[in-house]
Amino acid sequence: MTRAFNFSAGPATLPESVLRQAQAEMLDWHGSGASIVEMSHRGAEFMSVAAEAEADLRRLLDIPEDYAVLFLSGGATTQQALIPLNFAAPGQRADYVVSGHWGKTAVKQAGVYVDVNIAASSEANGYRELPARADWQLSPDAAYVHLTANETIHGVEFRDVPDTGNVPLIADFSSSIASEPLDVRRYGVIYAGAQKNLGPVGIAVMIIRLDLLERSGQPRADIFDYRSHVARDSMLNTPPTWNWYLAGLVFKWMLAEGGVAEFAKRNAAKAALVYGAIDGSGGFYRNEVAHAARSRMNIPFFLPDAELDARFVAEAKAAGLLALKGHKVVGGIRASLYNAMPLAGAEALVAFMADFQQRHG
């Protein structure tokens, strides 16, 4: 069987070796006579899987001991609602930097619980660049500052960590976590849905500085309280064990491949290929994002008209290049180049782009 190159923004492509290992272990995990999906989350077998996954993630991202790591059901949008509940008092101000669709979603979720101050936004220019740091209007008494590290739809990415002083910085890293070295200590909280760089859909990773858990936050049930999840090692309720197991396999794969430093090199090479093809097309393909803000993970681009966009997607699919249709918010084309996308995938896309332009340009 020949696998296609899957450029989906999420759920995204997974390493073939991980999928094959999961396939081989599906019926009989490590000689136990049972599948991992059948095992109790509190049994010794799965507890070992969970402990290894946390240890491997800590090693992969160099997470300090004074940060808790959680594996929780759901995705990043759920955490966007839980973050103000846990880290801000009722009605307290929280600063939000909006650089795209998901930053705007975070504002909507938080607005139910806190006084949201949109400290900066690039919406006026269509999210084609990052909000200029000099224009940020931060609140000295804010509970936290929130930003989205990489916007999958608009294709913009923060590469430098902004200094927020004594106010904790909270960041949604769903689409760029583990794609390059990350200084965890610059953040109060890092959160990410797993389905782009860390594993399958259905599980989220939280990295929380322990002192922030001392905040009383707002009245909430235990299931919405990060302190309760930390106290129970992410097993306050039955976790998505299969997703956790698969994420653990992805962590091991990344470590074996050389860790985040190696993936930073690979991701830079893939992005350079695709942006090079766009910029060298004489305008047939165009990316509208300011060069300094361009995402390495998600590259949106457009052809001269919508009819050509649709033809590009259809012909690419026939050529074994999947899920290149842009998000409905912006249209066009989008190529997602997460860690599990090999260089050969970017090369195949660039070759197809050249051929398509020759035939339709």
Swiss-Prot record:
- TM region positions: none
For this chain's UniProt record, which GO biological process terms are given? L-serine biosynthetic process; pyridoxine biosynthetic process
Q: Which PROSITE patterns match?
A: AA_TRANSFER_CLASS_5
What is its subcellular localisation? Cytoplasm
Which top-level group of life is the source organism from? Bacteria
EC numbers listed for it are 2.6.1.52
Identify residues that carry N6-(pyridoxal phosphate)lysine. 196
Its GO CC terms are:
cytoplasm
- Name the catalysed reactions: O-phospho-L-serine + 2-oxoglutarate = 3-phosphooxypyruvate + L-glutamate; 4-(phosphooxy)-L-threonine + 2-oxoglutarate = (R)-3-hydroxy-2-oxo-4-phosphooxybutanoate + L-glutamate
**Which cofactors does this protein require?**
pyridoxal 5'-phosphate
Q: Name one GO molecular function term.
A: O-phospho-L-serine:2-oxoglutarate aminotransferase activity
* Pathway info: Amino-acid biosynthesis; L-serine biosynthesis; L-serine from 3-phospho-D-glycerate: step 2/3; Cofactor biosynthesis; pyridoxine 5'-phosphate biosynthesis; pyridoxine 5'-phosphate from D-erythrose 4-phosphate: step 3/5
Enzyme type, top EC level: transferase
UniProt cofactor note: Binds 1 pyridoxal phosphate per subunit.
Please tell me where L-glutamate binds in this chain. 42
Q: Which residues form a coiled coil?
A: none
Pfam families according to UniProt: Aminotran_5
Which UniProt key words apply to this protein? Amino-acid biosynthesis, Aminotransferase, Cytoplasm, Pyridoxal phosphate, Pyridoxine biosynthesis, Serine biosynthesis, Transferase
Residues bound to pyridoxal 5'-phosphate are 76-77, 102, 152, 172, 195, 237-238
Q: What interactions and quaternary structure are annotated?
A: Homodimer.
Its family remark reads: Belongs to the class-V pyridoxal-phosphate-dependent aminotransferase family. SerC subfamily.
- Which function does this protein serve? Catalyzes the reversible conversion of 3-phosphohydroxypyruvate to phosphoserine and of 3-hydroxy-2-oxo-4-phosphonooxybutanoate to phosphohydroxythreonine.
Q: Which NCBIfam families match?
A: PRK05355.1 (NF003764), serC_1 (TIGR01364)
Full protein name: Phosphoserine aminotransferase
- The species this protein belongs to is Stenotrophomonas maltophilia (strain R551-3)
The upper taxonomy is: Bacteria, Pseudomonadati, Pseudomonadota, Gammaproteobacteria, Lysobacterales
Gene transcribed to yield this protein: serC
